[in-house]
């Protein structure tokens, strides 16, 4: 049996679940818990695409798109695995940031490394604490 171990809310003692959230440029609605395939958007590009080394993505299980909790990943772009116009990550996962410096360090990270600090360079006004 698969058991997730994400962020446990100290007030409820329950695992936090964050929905898949994707937005398309010029579209009024934000889409939640639906992949591009679910929506029939086979050629769309999200507002924040997985298009470059260091794209920061939110993780969820393969079984559900609404069970993200506390895990994320850095997209390590490889042209042969992600040919132009055929990025299968877009619309299945949500990007929420980009690494802008330190790519040499990024490529050396392992799952056992610890992030000590992060600086938000733009967009802090959009942060919703305890949302």
Question: What function would you assign to each model-found segment?
Answer:
Residues 2-131:
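Cross-family detector of peptidyl-prolyl cis-trans isomerase
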